[in-house]
Amino acid sequence: RRTFFHLRAANALWSGNDLDFARTRARIFHLGYLLLLDELDKPDKTHGTRAAALLAAAQAAGLKTSADVVSEDSERFTRVVIPALKFVDYCIVNEFEAGKTAGFKIRQPDGTLDTVALRHAAGALLQLGVKELVVVHFPEGAFARTRKGEDFWQPAVNLPTKAIAGTAGAGDALCAGVLLGLHEGWDIQRCLLTGNCAAAACLTDPTCTGGMRSLKAALDLAKKHRFCPPLEPAEA
């Protein structure tokens, strides 16, 4: 479990009006976190929310868009997150956020992952408007579903308990690894592998960034520790 003490400060006021997408050479615009950006979480008559309008502007300028969500236990997901999905190319969230947005319980009563509900939630996020790819990550690994209906699974790196110093930032590290792969045009399985290795690297330090290392060093963690058991029999 993690406890966050957060002061929104300037994030509560930022509207994105200072961004000029026509001048950037970037390929991907990543926006995070929905539910923590007060100004962008406000309603917008045309797009649903101001965050959705900002993502739409990025898409109109030719950028691929990605959005992340904070794990907030509230009923705001329908009002704030869903409108943005229509303007998101890559939706990368954890199982709690996917479940809250799509309306599924992805954990069974005993805490195990419900892979059927997970598939349904990913499909629902695509139906809600995500353009290309949904990635759902969790301590056991990650799952991806494409707009074409292709499914991909990647178990987590099997780090020994003594090597885990903290879990803060692991989801963001996975997201960064996946986005790196998408930016470079890698296949989805390689993107998930890279994301999981980045998450494993993050786990080795109690801070959000102290465990990060070179791509090769992160990938070497998988070679050293191998992977957790397959999430579904078909992976074996």
Residue ranges and their predicted role:
Residues 1-152, 157, 208-223, 227-236:
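Ribokinase/PfkB-type carbohydrate-kinase core domain
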Residues 158-235:
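Conserved post-catalytic alpha-helical subdomain immediately downstream of the catalytic base
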